[in-house]
């Protein structure tokens, strides 16, 4: 299994979607993550694991913590933690719709899509 995600450092794609998932209480998380791993190529789909998810799996990662919120005069930078973040990257908008549906089906029963942010270049 390749653990690198080259999409993180790649150029900005023409279209993207950021999907933020909430872990469902009492759900079997590990099997859903294994299904997700099979879809993740690190280029078209980049995955980020939140601190709450990592801790619920009993596998803490040194240095991993929730992003703090900041407030400066005229500027708020909120903290928007999620259990799981998926960054979909594509040159076609239609691909993102299909990928989003596939991810929701793959993670069903363990995660719920909480927020989606679409982006374009």
Predicted features along the sequence, with ranges:
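Long, low-complexity, Ser/Thr/Gly/Pro-rich intrinsically disordered segments that act as flexible linkers
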Residues: 1-121
């Amino acid at each position: 299994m390749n653990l690198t995600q080259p999409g993180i450092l790649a150029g900005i794609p023409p279209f993207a979607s950021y999907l933020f998932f909430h872990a469902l209480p009492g759900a079997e998380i590990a099997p859903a993550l294994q299904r997700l791993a099979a879809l993740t190529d690190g280029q078209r789909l980049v995955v980020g694991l939140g601190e709450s998810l990592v801790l619920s799996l009993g596998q803490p990662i040194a240095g991993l913590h929730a992003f703090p919120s900041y407030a400066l005069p005229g500027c708020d930078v909120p903290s928007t933690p999620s259990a799981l973040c998926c960054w979909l990257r594509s040159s076609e908008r239609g691909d993102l719709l299909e990928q989003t549906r596939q991810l929701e089906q793959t993670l069903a029963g363990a995660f719920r899509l909480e927020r989606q942010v679409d982006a374009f270049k």
